[in-house]
A protein has these predicted regions:
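An acidic-aromatic substrate-binding cleft motif
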Residues: 258-330, 334-338
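Acidic, contiguous internal or C-terminal segments within carbohydrate-active enzymes
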Residues: 29, 53, 126-127, 131-186, ...
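Active-site-proximal substrate-binding groove within the catalytic cores of carbohydrate-active enzymes
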Residues: 44, 63, 244-250, 463-679, ...
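Beta-strand-rich recognition/accessory modules
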Residues: 33-36, 41-43, 168, 178-180, ...
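Acidic-aromatic substrate-binding/catalytic surfaces of carbohydrate-active enzymes
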Residues: 37-136, 750-775
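Aromatic- and acidic-residue-enriched carbohydrate-binding clefts of CAZyme catalytic domains
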Residues: 277-280, 284, 327-361, 382-412, ...
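C-terminal beta-sandwich/jelly-roll accessory domains of carbohydrate-active enzymes
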Residues: 615-626, 635-637, 642-805, 811-870, ...
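Active-site-adjacent "subsite" loops/lids of carbohydrate-active enzymes
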Residues: 284, 288-308, 368-428, 514-515
């Protein structure tokens, strides 16, 4: 048969097939629209969604708020958003010429709504009150069928849309990208968030707002204003042939908000699509305590094994569970449990009976066994694992230690890893995984997956399949997927937590008095970069921030460090709003005070988790030494965890913001500082107001916000206080630091009050203003001659001061910055004194000298650093000490017995505070 005859025959077959209606889905007969036109709707009590088809072509869609819902949520008028409903299919067409193209090789092509004709629709009622509208189309020039599916939940304020394509006739066209939304949006007032890789796009509307995004971590979502028009583009790469079985995109969400709090509504939506509900989850991790025997000079009693693991379980049970009543959700074996030269096989010598004896022992306290996996090969001795896997036929990329890794999308290795993680859940009761180290690209041929950008999807799908597989075995398993992830909010469809970015720990280039202070600042800068500079929309509660670190083999603090500084780190870790409470500790080296700090902080965080789970970072840049805070609001309650990363005192303004979750109508709110000391502000606040929080140098402070009528304890406002005892209805309070206007905010709960042995009126307590005693007097800082590197500091430290230190901050002039740092020596009252320093990578550095109460003269000698002939700069001189304050007492008898909940730890003695007093500045030039 001639080529021309073949072409005519193929054309007649194609024409006949296009006249045939599409096959209806089983159980759902197809419904044909009249004259290729129609208006189709989905609606619930909150929103109405409408799709318009005109002249056989998809025309527009509209999502609008219902007046009742809009009014109930404080919207000025019902919001609405309309799009042209367009989409894009980027296809490599296998044909003589692609639709709309002239030349044979002119490919690929993007098929949009103009390339398809409407042929029918179907409306479905789904479980839980959900509705689905399916619209069917056929391509005008090639044999592709398209289905647009829209879903609306019973109480949803968002509609989801997906694209499905199939080819029952040819099956050789290649789908490059699904652009699930691609077109114009009307009604946009201003763009709040342009979107990006894995990020949602969001905008304000008249009366509310809107957000868009593909429910897939590796998708692209973009919303831009061009020449006064808003354009939306949401899509994902695919890389598959379009065949009879069809290909379906992930859902793209379009959410409508009834007010301007778009981000808050987006997080509400996220709670409805996450794989697992947010919950506190505490764990111990062996990484800084137990490791593999291959580690050089590793102590035999710290080699990971059944024996050493059971010993740690016993210590944790006694120190944490029995003594403090805390729950430990998981005991996690980090790197070291498997044979490095194997396909993830347990070490038989260290675990002769397998993992079941450990898992059974953990069950006695309701603790799950957890395991670490390094999907691409791990870190320690990774080349042993990678080379063994390569030799045994598993897919590997690269050959040297810097780039060699296992391919998670490889046919053989992907199947192996899925089987291993599933078997450990089924056979050993594993209830937690830490999957650490991922790579989302591989262009090695022969691995059984698409190459180039499509390998990203192959790895993502392999990982998602692992997540689904282990959740089928144990729906409550906790999945922590770490290095290699990015802050797309749609990771919560698969994982409980992902990595915050940055290093496990680090030390910020901000002058710090201790390593732990520097580590706190580093961690908070990483989060500042995530949430303030990069503007990632991601729930902080779903981040792994690498928990409390104090191990025998690694610690971010000194072996013997001040308890209050350790507790600052511990409490702030929980108060950021994380849900995974990680203990990277050696349980047998912690002091009783450190255990108490961990236990009380964790108990407080668990109790306050419904509020803490809603987090927003505010304030300045930690790396610039600016004060900052983590704010949490829900309903009428709030928590603010604030910190000042430098010695100079600061004031931080925090808005009581409905946009972050505070009830817009909330009023009569108490502001109480609950750490490091207790103090209630004398006035009541309401939503929308701002509060000014004073922060001393290097202070971490935690505040709670709640309605005054919910307080069950006496609220002594305008004074710092300690509750000494609570027995039944009796409450004894000691107080100091009284300011003008101090009073009891809730006298109505008091039956009687006694001060100085006399009954007093609780509504008019005699609380005269007082002054704090001086910590230091007679201060003087003097140079010893011009241009000489010596100076003298004189002061008298009060007998009420303890743990005093003279703190010297050396700040180089820009001309001296970057060179070797100077060293200091000192003499106190003529005797040589020890000078301690905290090594600092930045420009400035702290030196400290311990001092006792009394009058002192300290001579300080500065010497240039190695190979340095000159140092120009300034020295800030501070006196740091704790001081006991004179206190008074009030005894209260309450009308009802309170039921006090957990509170943050107390790290200072009653009436004691830490003070920083600046003695002066001095310039040095030598």
């Amino acid at each position: 048969m001639r080529r021309s005859q073949l072409f005519l025959l193929a054309a007649w077959i194609f024409f006949f097939l296009t006249l045939c209606p599409p096959t209806a889905r089983a159980g759902h007969p197809e419904q044909q629209a009249d004259n290729g036109a129609g208006t189709f709707s989905l609606q619930n009590e909150r929103v109405r969604f409408t799709v318009v088809v005109e002249n056989g072509r998809l025309a527009a869609d509209r999502l609008e708020a219902k007046p009742g819902w809009s009014k109930a949520e404080g919207g000025a008028s019902p919001a609405a958003v309309e799009t042209d409903a367009d989409f894009g299919l980027e296809v490599m067409v296998t044909d003589w010429s692609a639709p709309g193209k002239v030349n044979n090789a002119e490919n690929p092509v993007v098929l949009t709504k103009k390339d398809f004709t409407f042929i029918g629709r179907e409306l479905k009622e789904l479980p839980e009150g959900r509705q689905e509208l399916d619209l069917d189309f056929k391509a005008k020039e090639i044999s592709i069928r398209l289905r647009l599916a829209y879903q609306l939940g019973a109480e949803a304020f968002y509609v989801r849309r997906s694209l499905s394509v199939s080819d029952l006739e040819f099956g050789h066209h290649f789908l490059r990208w699904f652009w699930t939304r691609r077109g114009l949006v009307s009604g946009i007032g201003s763009v709040l968030k342009n979107g990006g890789f894995g990020q949602p796009a969001a905008a304000l509307l008249d009366g509310g707002g809107v957000f868009f995004g593909v429910e897939y971590p590796a998708a692209e979502n973009h919303l831009d204003m061009r020449e006064g028009r808003a354009e939306i583009l949401c899509g994902q790469e695919y890389g598959r042939l379009i065949g009879a079985d069809g290909l379906t995109s992930d859902w793209v969400v379009e959410g409508l908000t009834p007010n301007s709090f778009v981000k808050n509504w987006f997080f509400r939506y996220l709670d409805e699509v996450r794989a697992a509900p947010l919950r506190p989850f505490s764990l111990y991790n062996t990484w800084y305590d137990l490791r593999a025997p291959e580690y050089p000079d590793w102590p035999p009693d710290k080699v990971m094994s059944e024996r050493t693991a059971l010993r740690m379980v016993d210590i944790l049970r006694r120190s944490m569970i029995e003594k403090h009543g805390l729950k430990l959700d998981a005991f996690v074996l980090d790197d070291g449990w498997d044979v490095y030269e194997s396909d993830w096989v347990l070490r038989g010598e260290q675990w002769p009976r397998g993992l079941k004896p450990l898992a059974e022992e953990l069950k006695k306290t309701g603790t799950a066994l957890g395991l670490w996996f390094g999907p691409t090969g791990g870190y320690s001795f990774r080349m042993k694992r990678v080379n063994w896997m390569r030799a045994h036929g598993y897919e590997v990329v690269g050959r040297d230690k810097n780039n060699a890794r296992l391919c998670l999308a490889g046919t053989k290795y992907g199947a192996l890893l899925k089987k291993r993680v599933t078997d450990f859940v089924a056979d050993d009761g594993v209830g937690y995984y830490k999957w650490d180290g991922l790579q989302f690209s591989c262009s090695e041929p022969g691995h059984g997956h698409p190459l180039d950008i499509y390998s990203r999807r192959a790895v993502m799908e392999s990982l998602a399949d692992m997540c689904r597989a282990v959740r089928r075995e144990n729906p409550s398993i906790f999945l922590n997927i770490t290095s290699g992830t990015w802050l797309s909010p749609w990771w919560v469809k698969f994982a409980n937590t992902i990595w915050m970015q940055g290093m496990d720990y680090g030390f910020a280039d901000v002058p710090s008095l201790s390593r732990r202070e520097g580590a706190i600042t580093y961690r908070d800068f990483i989060l500042y970069d995530d949430f303030r500079q990069q503007d990632f929309w991601f729930p902080l509660a779903n981040l792994m921030t690498h928990g409390i670190i104090k191990g025998r083999h690694e610690s971010v603090g000194a072996a013997a460090e001040p308890l209050d500084k350790f507790t600052d780190d511990v409490l702030l870790y929980f108060a950021r709003g994380v849900s995974m409470y990680e203990l990277y500790i050696s349980p047998d080296i912690l002091t009783d005070g450190e255990w108490t700090s961990i236990a009380q902080s964790m108990a407080w965080a668990r109790d306050r988790f419904p509020v803490l789970m809603n987090s927003e970072m505010t304030g300045g840049n930690p790396l610039k030494g600016e004060a900052y805070a983590y704010v949490h609001f829900k309903g009428t309650r709030g928590i603010v965890a604030a910190r000042n990363p430098v010695m100079e005192p600061a004031r931080l303004e925090v808005k009581l913001d409905p946009a972050v979750g505070l009830d817009p109508g909330a009023g009569g709110l108490v502001l109480e500082r609950v750490y490091p000391t207790c103090r209630v502000w004398p006035r009541l606040y309401r939503a929308g107001e701002s509060v000014i929080l004073p922060l001393d140098g290097f202070e971490t402070a935690v505040y709670e916000l709640y309605p005054v009528q919910e307080a069950a304890r006496p609220l002594l406002a305008g004074a710092t206080f300690d509750v000494i005892s609570e027995q039944g209805k009796d409450c004894l309070v000691q107080y100091y630091g009284v300011e003008k206007g101090a009073k009891l905010l809730n006298p109505e709960i008091i039956e009687s009050a006694v001060m100085g042995g006399k009954s007093v009126n609780a509504g008019a307590l005699p609380l005269p203003e007082d002054e704090e005693p001086s910590l230091v007097t007679g201060m003087a800082v003097r140079p010893e001659g011009a241009g000489r590197p010596r100076f003298t500091v004189r002061f008298n430290l009060s007998e009420t001061g303890r743990e005093g230190a003279l703190a010297l901050l050396m700040m180089p002039d820009p001309s001296s910055a970057g060179g070797p740092k100077p060293s200091l020596s000192a003499r106190i009252d003529g005797a040589a004194a020890a000078v301690k320093t905290e090594p600092q990578e930045g420009r400035s550095q702290w030196f400290t000298i311990d001092v006792r109460p009394g009058k002192h003269e300290i001579a300080v000698q500065a010497r240039p650093g190695r190979d340095s002939q000159e140092w120009i700069g300034k020295v800030a001189v501070w006196l740091v000490a704790k001081q006991k304050q004179p206190t008074k007492e009030i005894s209260f008898r309450l009308k009802a017995e309170p039921k006090p909940g957990p509170r943050p730890p107390k790290v200072w003695a009653v009436g004691e505070i830490r003070k920083n007093v600046k003695l002066g500045d001095i310039s040095l030039n030598y």
